[in-house]
Amino acid sequence: MKLGIIAAMIVMRLLIVTARSQSLPNLLPLPNSSGWLETYNVNNAPISLTGAFFQSLGTNGRSCASCHVPTDGWTVSASGVQLRFLLTQGLDPIFRTNDGSNCDQNIDTSSVQGRRQAYSLLLQRGLIRVALSLPADAEFSVQSVSNPYGCNDTSMLSMYRRPLPATNLAFLSTVMWDGRESTPPSTQKITYPDTGQLLGDLAHQAMDATTGHAQGAPPTPAQIQDIVNFEMTLRTAQAIDKRAGFLNDGQATGGPVKLASQKFFVGINDSFPASFGFNPTGAAFNPNIFDLFDAWKNSQSSARARIARGQTIFNSKPITISGVAGINDVTGLPASFTGTCGTCHDSPNVGHHSVSAPLNIGVADVDSPLDISYLPVFTLVNNATGETVQTTDPGRALITGKWADIGKVKGPILRGLASRAPYFHNGSAATLMDVIRFYESRFNVSFSPKEKADLIAFLNSL
């Protein structure tokens, strides 16, 4: 029997068991196509399934866990959503028209086929619809919207985005893809070394998720605190590779337990020049972002050696970085320079940007090298110059109103990737190979077949 079938059976069994259970064992291995993922409760206790995170606090049956599932790396995967549709005929609480359907207008969810069509983006790409209006003082206007599902309103834009994982949140420098739940930029974001602002941001996110996604009244302060406390206990990472074995074996430091002791503060190892002052220690940038598998560099195991080679590629493969809004257009930075994956993924052994630095690398551009034909196209016009631009997601610009922020989103944490395909904020990369192909095309970087296989093995081991 194929591994994928076995994994699906295990996941189905887990869904049944957890529906009747009050907790998950700490460090329970959960299968994915590359091996097994584990979540570690930093309190070294079972992971409770009875708190506010798992309770339906709204009116549509949803809880936080509807879109942040342990088996999917605490987000949702396309395959996981498809399984839930199959098991419930599309009646699981994740399938709700307020934001789970492609549009909330002119849809028919009275039949299984109707629901399959209405929720096609959620099923195929794991996407939730995010509806936002322009800030009153926006530097641009919406000239037109071409949405294949309806929702063509120019005053309320519908974007389609992947839910971010509700684990490893202690490492965040920005909350949400567009930073809309983060402290306003007029104040220092999540100050070093105090995480109080992060906790406040997560509390606000929990409130907005309950009133929005769950269509409920604002949760009580006690419920919000319970959700945030729960989220902050979770550390998730790939723990076992089906070829290389345990990822903390042979002096390697993979897996979630080691991750729990990883040092982090906002600005740690920031890749911007020291003159920007983003790293409060003033330390120079270290391009060796990951050292999890240094001990495997000379391993006699071909699988372990491959993972170690992939780590080296991530840390050192030269990439010409140009045309990236948020980097190349920043005063004091060159229009083009040679960097690495770590230029944008600089947080040690975590892999996101350690400061709040939304970027536009081209994922939302209409000429993206990946298939984005399923996304709407927004034509935006600069109010001052008359310049127009087309994008599939205005990103951060819908929060700040700034023309320069169009298309910018944050880079996500890279741990637990194997359990949460598809990738990028719009789900346009179905596989990690698609991610690599995007970078090959967008940044004109060449990977040999061996380098691609090595890099994928490494990313799957995070």
Specify the residue positions occupied by each region the protein language model found.
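Periplasmic c-type cytochrome electron-transfer domains
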Residues: 21-462
